[in-house]
Amino acid sequence: SANAKNDFMRF
């Protein structure tokens, strides 16, 4: 989304 890093971290 806004931050690709956060998108991977939620998984």
UniProtKB/Swiss-Prot annotation:
GO terms for biological process: neuropeptide signaling pathway. It is found in: Secreted. Its main location: secreted. The modification Phenylalanine amide is found at F11. GO terms for cellular component: extracellular region. Keywords: Amidation, Neuropeptide, Secreted. The keyword Cytoplasm does not apply. Detected in the thoracic perisympathetic organs in larvae, and the dorsal ganglionic sheath in adults (at protein level). Belongs to the FARP (FMRFamide related peptide) family. This is FMRFamide-19.
